[in-house]
């Protein structure tokens, strides 16, 4: 078990304890430590109030002070230190109406979502496990802390989180917990699309995404998300962990949907990736020669095409053709990528101005086509990437 990150944070716990308060590691980091999984972020919980934490440490940032969280900067690292808290009634199935600071660890962990996330650990690596979370880890079981209906009623996102943990950890979901998921799934319509997307990404990229995706359909989750309700999501099959952008591209391509991606509130980069995948799907059947593949590698890049090949089972399951395997394969793509003469239009030794001057013409839509033809000719080594050679080629091949 890797203790390094905990040992780095141990002086913070010790300092809090030296000032007369309790302090523990808590949450996903403890769970992953007990499972011997990689640990990324350390969360600390304490009986000290936010004001008391600010009094103990000199370098702090009040990132969420009203909710009990102070960022403590120690050895150039940031650690979130959160006061033990209980929560009032939840509003809209997503946020508590009030946060109440308490001095009792039990009160703090009993508000958490799943038993596997409700384990606290001190700086001597002794655990406080009020809800048998460690036993559930050993039994590979996802189970809510207390009544599952209450937990999901408090925050419907916990339903998605439970499914995400099943996908990532390859655990089973406790039968009572799953029954409550079925009965409370409609409450996910109250969630913001931003929160849904964060969990959905992690779920789809989890090891058992191919098992959990059908559960989303079984629970009828997608009908409560406006963007997805117009798709027949149960007609889509997943064979491997998948990026959200590729899944949406497959849905859109297979079902010819023109639904606006703006409903998802994802980044422009993500939207471009989705459109790129859809365009790629339309062109894949045309990749029948090495010449066509060269231009394809230039247009889409080794990273995108390697990923598409990795996802060939999922694409095939959704009747998306990949092109002939003797042409479209990783060895051919690698070889072409290593030997590309140019990698982007700016690598060409001519530009639009050069073409206009050489032909004594004014600009127009034709120029874009000419530049594209030059690109393809250079890529396929029909002409060298030299200005004089390109100009001569244009004069003999271009009709305006």
From Swiss-Prot:
Any one GO biological process: tRNA 3'-terminal CCA addition
Reactions the enzyme catalyzes: a tRNA precursor + 2 CTP + ATP = a tRNA with a 3' CCA end + 3 diphosphate; a tRNA with a 3' CCA end + 2 CTP + ATP = a tRNA with a 3' CCACCA end + 3 diphosphate
Class in the EC hierarchy, top level: transferase
InterPro entries for this protein: Bact_CCA-adding_enz_type3_sf, CCA-adding_enz_C, CCA-adding_enz_firmicutes, NT_sf, PolA_pol_head_dom, PolyA_RNA-bd
Annotated residues for binding of Mg(2+): 41, 43
One term of GO molecular function: ATP binding
Keyword annotations: ATP-binding, Magnesium, Metal-binding, Nucleotide-binding, Nucleotidyltransferase, RNA repair, RNA-binding, Transferase, tRNA processing
UniProt cofactor(s): Mg(2+)
Note: A single active site specifically recognizes both ATP and CTP and is responsible for their addition.
Family the entry assigns: Belongs to the tRNA nucleotidyltransferase/poly(A) polymerase family. Bacterial CCA-adding enzyme type 3 subfamily.
Its biological purpose: Catalyzes the addition and repair of the essential 3'-terminal CCA sequence in tRNAs without using a nucleic acid template. Adds these three nucleotides in the order of C, C, and A to the tRNA nucleotide-73, using CTP and ATP as substrates and producing inorganic pyrophosphate. tRNA 3'-terminal CCA addition is required both for tRNA processing and repair. Also involved in tRNA surveillance by mediating tandem CCA addition to generate a CCACCA at the 3' terminus of unstable tRNAs. While stable tRNAs receive only 3'-terminal CCA, unstable tRNAs are marked with CCACCA and rapidly degraded.
Protein name, entry field: CCA-adding enzyme
Organism encoding this protein: Staphylococcus carnosus (strain TM300)
Lineage: Bacteria, Bacillati, Bacillota, Bacilli, Bacillales
């Amino acid at each position: 078990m890797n203790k390094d990150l905990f040992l780095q944070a141990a002086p913070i716990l010790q300092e809090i304890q030296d000032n007369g308060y309790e302090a523990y590691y808590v949450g996903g980091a403890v769970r992953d430590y007990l499972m011997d999984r990689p640990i990324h972020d350390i969360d600390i919980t304490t009986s000290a109030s936010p004001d008391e934490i600010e009094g103990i440490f000199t370098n702090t940032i009040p990132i969420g002070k009203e909710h009990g969280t102070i960022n403590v900067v120690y050895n150039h690292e940031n650690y979130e230190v959160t006061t033990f808290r209980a929560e009032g009634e939840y509003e809209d199935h997503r946020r508590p109406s009030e946060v109440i600071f308490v001095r009792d660890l039990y009160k703090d962990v009993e508000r958490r979502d799943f038993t596997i996330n409700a384990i606290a650990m001190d700086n001597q690596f002794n655990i406080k496990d009020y809800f048998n979370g460690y036993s559930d880890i050993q039994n590979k079981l996802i189970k809510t802390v207390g009544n599952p209906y209450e937990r999901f009623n408090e925050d419907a996102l916990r339903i998605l989180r439970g499914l995400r943990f099943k996908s990532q950890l390859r655990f089973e979901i406790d039968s009572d917990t799953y029954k409550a998921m079925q009965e409370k799934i409609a409450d996910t319509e109250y969630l913001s699309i931003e929160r849904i997307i964060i969990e959905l990404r992690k779920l789809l990229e989890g090891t058992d995404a191919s098992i959990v995706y059908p559960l989303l359909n079984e629970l009828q989750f997608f009908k409560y998300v406006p963007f997805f309700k117009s798709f027949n999501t149960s007609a889509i099959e997943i064979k491997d962990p998948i990026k959200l952008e590729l899944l949406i591209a497959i849905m859109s391509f297979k079902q010819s949907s023109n639904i606006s991606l703006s409903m998802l509130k994802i980044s422009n980069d993500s939207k471009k990736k989705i459109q790129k995948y859809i365009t790629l799907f339309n062109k894949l059947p045309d990749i029948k020669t090495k010449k066509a593949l060269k231009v394809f590698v230039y247009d889409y890049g080794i990273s995108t095409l390697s990923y598409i090949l990795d996802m060939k089972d999922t694409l095939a399951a959704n009747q998306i053709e990949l092109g002939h395997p003797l042409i479209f394969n990783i060895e051919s793509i690698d070889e072409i990528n290593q030997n590309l003469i140019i990698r982007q239009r700016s690598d060409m030794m001519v530009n639009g101005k050069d073409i206009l001057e050489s032909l004594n013409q004014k600009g127009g839509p034709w120029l874009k086509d000419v530049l594209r033809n030059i690109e393809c000719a250079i890529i396929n080594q029909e002409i060298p990437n030299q200005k004089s050679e390109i100009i001569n080629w244009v004069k003999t091949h271009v009709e305006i």
